[in-house]
Amino acid sequence: MSSLDNLVAEILQQAEKEANRILVKVKAENLEFTENENKKIQKEIENIQWKTNEEAISLKERIISNANLKSRDMVLQAKEELVDKVLKMTLERLKNLDSDSYLDFVENALKTLNISKNAEIILTKKMKDVLGKEIFGYKVSDDIVESGCNIKDGNVIYNNEFSSLLEFNKEDLEREILKKIFG
């Protein structure tokens, strides 16, 4: 499974570079946004000179707070886009696993299940062509999946497609990705 570890490390390294690029961009946008908001604040103060000093200060604080909220939202959106990009890259890499890593994945999936010897393994077209009609003592199904594998035992299908696994674990993966990239 070391190739999967290398794959994860490479993806995280690329994601970190992308995160840094996005953060620099967002910081520049935030600075410009804050400068524009400060100009708006100054105009508002000049327009309401007849109001008391407390009202002007209160308005300034609300505008700054609003700018900070918008800034925070921009950063959150950039992080969300980064996570989506990392997950998309991960899915593409998983779809292109070499046959040894793919077999390791299928074997691990089989180890976690209590299935009968009559179960069938549903593979990707590419791996079905490479691996043949039987693996690990189980028949390879005529059906195919887009990525990963499914295991059919009677009327029960165990979904181990990579896209489904990533979606199922998305919240945990998001936390882990953001933790690895941003500390």
Swiss-Prot record:
GO terms for molecular function: ATP binding; proton-transporting ATP synthase activity, rotational mechanism; proton-transporting ATPase activity, rotational mechanism. Keywords: ATP synthesis, Hydrogen ion transport, Ion transport, Transport. GO terms for cellular component: proton-transporting two-sector ATPase complex, catalytic domain. Gene3D superfamilies: F1F0 ATP synthase subunit B, membrane domain. GO terms for biological process: proton motive force-driven plasma membrane ATP synthesis. It comes from the Bacteria. InterPro entries: ATPase_V1_Esu. Belongs to the V-ATPase E subunit family. Produces ATP from ADP in the presence of a proton gradient across the membrane. This is V-type ATP synthase subunit E.
